[in-house]
């Protein structure tokens, strides 16, 4: 619930007037990094109960990011005739999400070394 509320606040605070779904893209990329970093570093370093780790990872980060919004916004871009933007959005979301997850894991490894 808190993740979804934060997603909404970021969307209306920073990206309300944009035709391109910058809010969802930014949030999904940040969430990809955050979930990878949490699971590969924080949850190993800080002793949390499995229930609390799941609540933070799946609950907060899962509700912060959203695949359904990505899907709906992509279809809307196609329906509005913005085919190129729709394709760019999907590609950047997918490749960017994978890249940010990779960076999250990489940062956690570097932090663990030091």
Curated annotation (Swiss-Prot):
A GO MF label: metal ion binding
A GO BP annotation: cellular detoxification of fluoride
Keyword entries, A-Z: Cell membrane, Ion channel, Ion transport, Membrane, Metal-binding, Sodium, Transmembrane, Transmembrane helix, Transport
Pfam families: CRCB (PF02537)
Protein localization: Cell membrane
Transmembrane segments: 23-43, 52-72, 84-104
GO terms under cellular component: plasma membrane
Main location, first listed in the record: membrane
Catalytic activity: fluoride(in) = fluoride(out)
InterPro entries in the cross-refs: FluC (IPR003691)
Activation and inhibition: Na(+) is not transported, but it plays an essential structural role and its presence is essential for fluoride channel function.
Domain of life: Bacteria
Topology in the lipid bilayer: Multi-pass membrane protein
Residues bound to Na(+): 62, 65
Annotated function: Fluoride-specific ion channel. Important for reducing fluoride concentration in the cell, thus reducing its toxicity.
Family to which this protein belongs: Belongs to the fluoride channel Fluc/FEX (TC 1.A.43) family.
Name of this chain's protein: Fluoride-specific ion channel FluC 1
Organism: Desulfitobacterium hafniense (strain Y51)
Gene: fluC1
């Amino acid at each position: 619930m808190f993740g979804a509320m934060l997603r909404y606040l970021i969307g209306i605070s920073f990206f309300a007037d944009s035709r391109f779904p910058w809010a969802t893209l930014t949030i999904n990329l940040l969430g990809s990094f955050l979930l990878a970093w949490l699971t590969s570093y924080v949850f190993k370093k800080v002793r949390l109960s499995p229930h609390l780790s799941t609540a933070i990872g799946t609950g907060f980060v899962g509700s912060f990011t959203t695949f359904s919004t990505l899907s709906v916004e992509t279809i809307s871009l196609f329906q509005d005739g913005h085919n190129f933007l729709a394709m760019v959005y999907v590609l950047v979301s997918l490749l960017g999400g994978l890249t940010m997850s990779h960076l999250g894991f990489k940062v956690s490894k570097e932090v663990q070394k030091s």
